[in-house]
């Protein structure tokens, strides 16, 4: 029946500074190899991060059986940095070290180096709220909403709305299980939610410039300036929606426990750096929202105290998981991305191709068909017919003759952990296994 409220502001400031001073003497091997009388360098960088968060909590129990918890708040995060580097060579004496940078002859000769830069400022602002309701700790409902704005996106797409709904039923608190003493906890849950992703570098929506090649201008070499990367003002939030069903249990005086989850995820407006035509673009890649990805799987965990005594405990837990991902849409029809280049020798090209309706993890390679009577390699072509890899001057090792084969992603990932505790001592053993993959 009581009501509890709490409001709390939080301010965080993180400032980091890095400085490095280096001097290489006249007699150092680097100076001798480059015919220089010493060398000095200064390196400086700093990183500034500010975070502000304010939120209010609300808690109320009414009619003894009903509990409501709620929180609402605001958060702000900002990051930025800068750096400066300089180097000079050929100093008259060693004794001054790196503290008289101007006397090195490389500066007067125009051969000293100096550069500086400033990171684009990044900001993230969030308004959020969450409410949890339970009846006798038996039936539970939760709802949350978050509105986030990120400076990484274009002016018209900076804000995204993300939400989640979930419900749970603690069956172990029902009257029909009250006398079943070996069941300590049994709960089923169902949830659906949408989250956003802005996990890529800054500066993809605003034109940035830097000095590059030197060009002669009126008899003087001057640096030319060019854009750092292609910009895309239409970038927007990548969104992941997930439907999840789960079961939690604890049995036999909490000596045996476990959980099972099955999920279906979909990612829309995937953020990816893709190839770009030159011209009209200046660089050969551009960040885009290019498609959607489907992800399905399950996870299972079973653990327990095998031995439990006053001074000694042996705990073991087993975890299994399965996951399958498929590209549902990737850019325009017929678009694909070739990745993971084979090492030399032979220059066999790439091993992976991402395209519509293809399961992630498959290899995209030439399919070996054996050797002919002369010992030459044979492959399956695009029509699945056996042809020589190289027929005289004609090579059949072309992309259209590649096939999707195998899969590098394991069908099941298994882990088995063991922990032994004796008084204040403990020993842990972790075993991992990847099953059924190519």
For the regions a language model picked out, list residue spans one by one.
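Structural motif
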Residues: 255, 424-426
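Surface-exposed, extracytoplasmic segments of Gram-negative outer-membrane nutrient-acquisition systems
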Residues: 218-228, 266-290, 325-409, 417, ...
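Extracellular/periplasmic, surface-exposed regions of secreted and cell-surface proteins
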Residues: 1, 5-24, 35-351
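Oxyanion-binding "anion nests"
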Residues: 420-421
